[in-house]
């Protein structure tokens, strides 16, 4: 166990793995998985490690997916992109804008790789991946069989997909298909974007505004290790939301399809006066309460303790129980993040 995982997770938590393998194509990925499995080892496939918290040393092989490549098909109604899972997400967003293919600008600066984007159904500022996803290409690890799932088959939900359930361990994502409509329509429902004029705004202006909001509010993982939003924004019933708003009328709330209401986890945490709170080397970020940071050589236990404290305080004040968006990795694979911090 002497391969440090510190360079492979944006939290900068220092645990080890038995083996770390970089796979630059599908065959290398399959070979690494099949070799490790034959040895009886657990296997974890990572992109940029921007949404994981390692709780302890990993007793197996970590495969870093570095499958690259971007192919573009120009159709009358849309541009269709076939993108390797190992491509950096933000670089893809910049590239599509430079090439005059807008549609991803609200998702600028989301850390991580393209292959991770469907797992979480990444989203920001009113847009989720499912809006632009055409398909996801996977490989069945045991057989090498290729499978293409349509966007519908991916069963996208809020920070959720089939890749967190049936497809979690048996398949690896090798490419993502995107469909960017030529009739561009800006999404200006959140934050500073609401100030932009929908009749004159350009994709580049939306991109610039999103980048500005993210860089001013969110810490740079190279300075303070973090995994972006630590908690999901809770989605509650209309009754729960109504009761909460009666008591806290200024609480941000976003009605969802089906009658439920999404609340802002960052606001709930902020109302508990937790910004800047520190436990061991972990802290709640001072600008954006939704982000927990590695302030000073944090151990995973520090982050877990802090997350538990935040969850308890918010639960006691609002009777709303936050769930981590970050995936928790134990010695032999993913464990329940909610149970870990409960």
UniProtKB/Swiss-Prot annotation:
It comes from Shigella boydii serotype 4 (strain Sb227). One of its GO terms (cellular component) is cytosol. Residues 13-183 form the FAD-binding PCMH-type domain. The active site is at 159, 229 (proton donor), 325. Its cofactor is FAD. It is an enzyme of class 1 (oxidoreductase). The keyword Cell wall biogenesis/degradation applies. This is UDP-N-acetylenolpyruvoylglucosamine reductase. GO terms for molecular function: FAD binding; UDP-N-acetylmuramate dehydrogenase activity. Pathway: Cell wall biogenesis; peptidoglycan biosynthesis. It catalyses: UDP-N-acetyl-alpha-D-muramate + NADP(+) = UDP-N-acetyl-3-O-(1-carboxyvinyl)-alpha-D-glucosamine + NADPH + H(+).
């Amino acid at each position: 166990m002497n391969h440090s995982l510190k360079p492979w997770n944006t939290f900068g938590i220092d645990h080890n793995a038995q083996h770390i393998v970089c796979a630059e194509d599908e065959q290398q990925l399959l070979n690494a998985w099949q070799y490790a499995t034959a040895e009886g080892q657990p296997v974890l496939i990572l992109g940029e490690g921007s949404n994981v918290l390692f709780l302890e040393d990993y007793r197996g092989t970590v495969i870093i997916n570095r499958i690259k490549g971007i192919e573009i098909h120009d159709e009358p109604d849309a541009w269709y992109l076939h993108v390797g899972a190992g491509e950096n997400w933000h670089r893809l967003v910049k590239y599509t804008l430079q090439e005059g293919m807008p549609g991803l600008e609200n998702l600028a600066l989301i850390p991580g790789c393209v292959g991770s984007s469907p797992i979480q159904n990444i989203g920001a500022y009113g847009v989720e991946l499912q809006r632009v996803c055409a398909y996801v290409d996977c490989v069945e690890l045991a057989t090498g069989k290729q499978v293409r799932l349509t966007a519908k088959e991916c069963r996208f939900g809020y920070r959720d997909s089939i890749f967190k359930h049936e497809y979690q361990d048996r398949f690896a994502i090798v490419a993502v298909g995107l469909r960017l409509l030529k009739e561009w329509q800006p999404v200006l429902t959140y934050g500073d974007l609401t100030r932009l004029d929908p009749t004159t705004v350009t994709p580049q202006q939306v991109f610039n505004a999103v980048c500005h909001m993210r860089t001013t509010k969110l810490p740079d993982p190279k300075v303070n290790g973090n995994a972006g939003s630590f908690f999901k924004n809770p989605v509650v019933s209309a009754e729960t939301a109504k009761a909460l708003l009666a008591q806290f009328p200024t609480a941000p709330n976003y009605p969802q399809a089906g009658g439920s209401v999404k609340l802002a986890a960052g606001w709930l945490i902020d109302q508990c006066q937790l910004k800047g709170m520190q436990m061991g080397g972990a802290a709640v970020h001072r600008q954006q309460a939704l982000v927990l940071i590695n302030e000073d050589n944090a151990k995973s236990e520090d982050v877990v303790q802090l997350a538990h404290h935040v969850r308890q305080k918010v639960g006691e004040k609002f009777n709303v129980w936050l769930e981590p968006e970050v995936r928790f990795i134990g010695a032999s694979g993913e464990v329940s993040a909610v149970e870990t911090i409960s």
